[in-house]
């Protein structure tokens, strides 16, 4: 199977557009070389995905940080000429010959994670999420409407079977959810945003809102997103800085779901996700934090990036910080264990709080 001449022409057009875009600094632009285009433009996965499916979001959104997505699991192998260097650069030097370590969520270590901010002076809230793909289904651009609905039905059955008093809750499909409820869930940081242009350009928003929804317990401290960017996003969050409590709840919830739904894992890349930035552990552990003194300094971004921390705005990726509150998380998700990913955030934040306390 080979890509049509039209698709190959579109791939070349994306390449030319990126090379001519002086304002673009995405990893796609850097690693989509003439040679990579020539070697890969005619390839097609067994499900029919091409290099165009991989690069079209970054081609349309020149402000992308990364710019590529995997339309199916095979893409990570078939288009390795592009994925491997992007993965290596994003995940702290994870090489094509490296392998994701076995899963270690840190069950035995949660006790080491004392509250980062017991006096409640800095941290507004803590959240740890991981992504999962259900075995047997491709990713967004290759999913049919029936696939989305079947996955949602399967997940509803699993949610209904949860009896743990802390975790049990209700699934709310996006279809039929009233605008007011939706807006409030998004504003309160519980639900994913709609109409993300990066995902739209990657063909990830088809048949919306069918098959999409959110499960949460009564306190909204354990949540599962269904069919947004990934098949599943499993989330634990609460106010304050008690990372240990948040992690313990995530582990409990993840184990419950995993016992009923087999997830797709790659022998080298770990848990599989739609975006290569989430491969491996898929863990993003974040706090919403106020650091008025050090965040005003010129070297704040550098201090964070030296500690492998990522800074986002208050409403998530591609949003701005408001009222001096930042979303700070681990950046690397591949090439370390789940516990180490959480620890990367934890140790870095401990240091940032010390610096804030010491700042004049
Ligand atoms: N520590 C936190 N406390 C409260 N809300 C949070 C925290 N971290 C992230 N959020 C909220 O979670 C929502 C999703 O954020 P965002 O999309 O950036 O991250 P994500 O779910 O990790 O996925 P992705 O990295 O794929 O974008 C946003 O509303 C964001 O404000």
Swiss-Prot record:
Amino-acid positions noted as binding ATP in the UniProt annotation, renumbered to this chain: 125-129, 189, 233, 284-288, 312-317, 327
Keywords, ordered alphabetically: ATP-binding, Kinase, Nucleotide-binding, Transferase
Gene3D superfamilies reported for this sequence: ATP:guanido phosphotransferase, N-terminal domain, Glutamine synthetase/guanido kinase, catalytic domain
Reactions mediated catalytically: L-arginine + ATP = N(omega)-phospho-L-arginine + ADP + H(+)
Pfam families attached to this UniProt entry: ATP-gua_Ptrans, ATP-gua_PtransN
GO terms under cellular component: extracellular space
InterPro entries to which the protein is assigned, alphabetical: ATP-guanido_PTrfase (IPR000749), ATP-guanido_PTrfase_AS (IPR022415), ATP-guanido_PTrfase_cat (IPR022414), ATP-guanido_PTrfase_N (IPR022413), ATP-guanido_PTrfase_N_sf (IPR036802), Gln_synth/guanido_kin_cat_dom (IPR014746)
Occurrences of domain Phosphagen kinase C-terminal (ranges): 122-359
Position of the signal peptide: none
Swiss-Prot/TrEMBL GO biological process terms: phosphocreatine biosynthetic process
Gene Ontology MF: a single term: creatine kinase activity
UniProt domain Phosphagen kinase N-terminal: residue ranges: 10-92
Domain of life (superkingdom): Eukaryota
Enzyme class, UniProt record, top EC level: transferase
Assigned EC number: 2.7.3.3
Residue numbers binding substrate: 65-69, 229, 275, 317
Annotated family: Belongs to the ATP:guanido phosphotransferase family.
Name of the protein described by the UniProt record: Probable arginine kinase ZC434.8
